[in-house]
Every structure is written in C-alpha cells, then in structure tokens.
C-alpha cells in the first residue's frame, strides 16, 4: 500500500510560506513582487489556468498583471508587449500561456522574455544555467516534482530514477534536477526498446508522456516512488495520469494522484520564481 503524496497540501504549505515572505518584503523593503501573465486567444483550458494563477497571486499577496490579447494578435505586437513588460520595474516574472496561435513562433516569444523575469524557467539562458548547476529560475513543474520528493522524505541520492518523456518542459529538466540530486538517471521515450524492463529497475519513476494510464502496476518495482506528471482524459472522460493509479498503488511505496498531485505544485513554484525574481532584482538575500 502506497503513501499518497498530497500535492495540494504541499503546494498550500509552499504558498503559505510565500505569503509570509511577501509580507516581509512589503514591510521591510516596500517591495511587492509582480507577475505578468499574457494570454493570446480564448482557449478555454488556458483561460482556466490564467484565472487560477491570478487567484493564487492574490492569495499570496503578489501583484498580478493580466494581458489578454485577441487570437489575431500579430507576433510583432506580442513581442512589443513582452519588451514593455521587460522594462517594467513592477513586473518580476513574465509568463506567456502556451500554446500560442499557429502564426506565432513560440520559441521566439519565450526567448524574448528577459532571463531575469523568466518565471516559467524556459529561456535558453536559464536552461543553460540549469545544466551547469548555477542558480537560476527553475522550470515550475520539474521543480514541483523535486519539492514533493523532498517533503516526502525521498532522497534521490544513489537511487535509479527513470523519467518517461523527454519534453523541454518536464522530461529533460526533471532529469537534470534528479542528476543534480545525485540520482542515476535514465530517460525513456517512444523509441526506447523494452520500456517495461527499464521502468521495472527504477527506484523513482517520473511519468511525463501525456498518454492515459500508460504505465501499469506490473512495471513498478515493489517500494518504488511514482510521480505522475501526466494529465489526460481517460476513456470514461475522467481526469487521469500517465500511470494506472489503482494497480501502481499496490506496488509503490509512495505515489502522486491525478488530479491533486503535481498540478497544484506547478502554480506554487511559479509564485516562488516570481518572489525570487523580485528579491534578485533588489539584491535581497
């Protein structure tokens, strides 16, 4: 029987710590951290994410600047807005909600964000610093995964961690973070031969592939820790992760649920990046 790693509770604790830290920054330094969120178009899922981020900012005492643009907004107009936010001293974190409309080059947009305001941790400069192990904005979801392991008392040192998925948003950065925590890391993907055998040797499994219930319990070594980053709709229309929760629960020593696992951590770490950005901008330790 697995211990359930409660992402909601851990995220709530992170957000409460941040709320107190923001209060101190306001009191001692007259500084209010600010996050600008840019949404292009009216994608319903993106609108929900943006609303959640705004609400989370308000609860933590962080200033929230929302920029909702029409789907017809040109790339040049979007880049001009980002440059304006780069120059705005009240903004310490900038997040452009993905996906963007097809006529806009996502990579160009992400690279236009100042590395010192890159709240999502996606800028190539910050990714490079992650590779070299230097202090940087960390990608929110992988950082949330690492925080969950830490709070749950799981030390990756000396353990075999298998990451399923090689995206720039989760797979690659979480592998780098696990490596920095002294785990032996294997990255698996759609071309990996005999995926099941590789996963069976893992002490820690991070599933981030976007395929509903892809990992069955028979792949999980007795006592392994399972972190499910996937968020999918199952055949029954219900939200589910990349791992088959019920069967993996029987084998794992600890597991994250979907929903209520990694998801809440992503927003908590986004707020943490914003507060860190404000402190760095004002040389506050």
Swiss-Prot record:
Superkingdom, taxonomy of origin: Bacteria
Amino-acid positions noted as binding NADP(+) in the UniProt annotation, renumbered to this chain: 165-167, 190, 231
Gene Ontology CC annotation, any one: cytosol
SUPFAM superfamilies (UniProt xref): Aminoacid dehydrogenase-like, N-terminal domain, NAD(P)-binding Rossmann-fold domains
Reaction equation(s) it catalyzes: (6R)-5,10-methylene-5,6,7,8-tetrahydrofolate + NADP(+) = (6R)-5,10-methenyltetrahydrofolate + NADPH; (6R)-5,10-methenyltetrahydrofolate + H2O = (6R)-10-formyltetrahydrofolate + H(+)
GO biological process, one term: methionine biosynthetic process
Pfam hit, one: THF_DHG_CYH_C
A GO MF label: methenyltetrahydrofolate cyclohydrolase activity
Keyword match Methyltransferase: no
Keywords: Amino-acid biosynthesis, Histidine biosynthesis, Hydrolase, Methionine biosynthesis, Multifunctional enzyme, NADP, One-carbon metabolism, Oxidoreductase, Purine biosynthesis
Keyword Transcription regulation: no
Pathway(s) of this molecule: One-carbon metabolism; tetrahydrofolate interconversion
Record-listed E.C. numbers: 1.5.1.5, 3.5.4.9
CDD domains, per the entry: NAD_bind_m-THF_DH_Cyclohyd (cd01080)
HAMAP family linked to this entry: THF_DHG_CYH
Quaternary structure annotation from Swiss-Prot or TrEMBL: Homodimer.
Function: Catalyzes the oxidation of 5,10-methylenetetrahydrofolate to 5,10-methenyltetrahydrofolate and then the hydrolysis of 5,10-methenyltetrahydrofolate to 10-formyltetrahydrofolate.
Family: Belongs to the tetrahydrofolate dehydrogenase/cyclohydrolase family.
Designated name of the protein: Bifunctional protein FolD
Species this protein is from: Magnetococcus marinus (strain ATCC BAA-1437 / JCM 17883 / MC-1)
């Amino acid at each position: 029987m697995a211990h359930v790693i409660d992402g909601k509770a851990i995220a709530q604790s992170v957000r409460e710590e941040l709320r107190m830290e923001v209060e101190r920054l306001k009191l001692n330094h007259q500084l209010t951290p600010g996050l600008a969120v840019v949404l292009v178009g009216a994608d319903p899922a993106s609108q929900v994410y943006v609303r959640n981020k705004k609400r989370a900012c308000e609860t933590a005492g962080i200033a929230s600047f929302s920029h909702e643009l029409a789907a017809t907004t040109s790339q040049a107009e979007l880049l001009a807005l980002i440059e304006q936010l780069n120059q705005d001293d009240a903004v310490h974190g900038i997040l452009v909600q993905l996906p963007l409309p097809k006529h806009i080059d996502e990579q160009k947009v992400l690279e236009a964000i100042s590395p010192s305001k890159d709240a999502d941790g996606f800028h190539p400069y910050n990714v490079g610093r992650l590779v070299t192990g230097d202090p940087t904005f960390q990608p929110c979801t992988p950082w949330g995964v690492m925080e969950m392991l830490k709070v749950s008392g799981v030390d990756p040192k000396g353990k075999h961690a298998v990451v399923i998925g090689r995206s720039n948003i989760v797979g690659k950065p979480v592998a780098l973070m696990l490596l920095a925590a002294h785990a032996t890391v294997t990255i698996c993907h759609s071309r990996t031969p005999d995926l099941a055998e590789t996963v069976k040797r893992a002490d820690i499994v991070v599933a981030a592939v976007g395929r509903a219930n892809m990992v069955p319990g028979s792949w999980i070594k007795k006592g392994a820790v399972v972190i499910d980053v996937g968020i999918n709709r199952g055949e029954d229309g219900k939200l589910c992760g990349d791992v088959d929760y019920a069967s993996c629960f029987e084998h794992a020593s600890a597991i994250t649920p979907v929903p209520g696992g990694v998801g809440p951590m992503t927003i908590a770490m986004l707020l943490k990046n914003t507060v860190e950005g404000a402190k760095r901008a004002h040389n506050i330790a």
